[in-house]
Amino acid sequence: MEQFHGTTIVSVRRGDKVALGGDGQVTLGNIVMKGGARKVRRIYNNQVLVGFAGGTADAFSLLDRFEAKLEKHQGNLTRAAVELAKDWRTDRMLRRLEAMLITADATTTLVITGNGDVLDPEGGICAIGSGGAYAQAAARALAENTELSPREIVEKSLEIAGDMCIYTNHNRIIETIE
């Protein structure tokens, strides 16, 4: 069976503002199945942003579990992320899920992987998915050389990733916390 491929999710934190954005393309093999998927969402009373890359069903499964962890830990992002990563690493069924998450609240941004990693990105910039390297490089260059807002940096870096990665389109959804 063919795998669902790619997307690009990028987050930029600058001062007390954070933006998280993603494209909308879902690809199965060499076919674009959907161009307007929503891979960036607000959860936990709109206080937490989450973006996902990887298998769509896998990502939704992890998103549900992450929301439950946030509820259990009263919105403590780091604690919820670590608990999800531990479950993901140790649970036989969860270990098969192929997805990654970026989560952000007013003070913290984290990348959560299926290897049990919970990473606090250096410089407040991170990206995942097939176009992640392009988006992250663009975001770093823009953050270091301009005064653009996090939202503007995310928008421009997604545009650049969409120009370079065949699994990333220009249908962007960007959420912010200020």
From Swiss-Prot:
Keywords, in A-Z order: Allosteric enzyme, Cytoplasm, Hydrolase, Metal-binding, Protease, Sodium, Threonine protease
GO cellular component: HslUV protease complex; proteasome core complex
Residues binding Na(+): G162, C165, T168
EC number from the UniProt entry: 3.4.25.2
GO annotation terms (biological process): proteolysis involved in protein catabolic process
Compartments reported by the entry: Cytoplasm
Regulation (activators, inhibitors): Allosterically activated by HslU binding.
Coiled coil: none
Domain of life: Bacteria
MF GO annotations: metal ion binding; threonine-type endopeptidase activity
PANTHER family for this protein: ATP-DEPENDENT PROTEASE SUBUNIT HSLV, METALLOPROTEASE TLDD
Job of this protein: Protease subunit of a proteasome-like degradation complex believed to be a general protein degrading machinery.
Family: Belongs to the peptidase T1B family. HslV subfamily.
The name this protein goes by in its record: ATP-dependent protease subunit HslV
Native species: Burkholderia ambifaria (strain MC40-6)
Gene of this entry: hslV
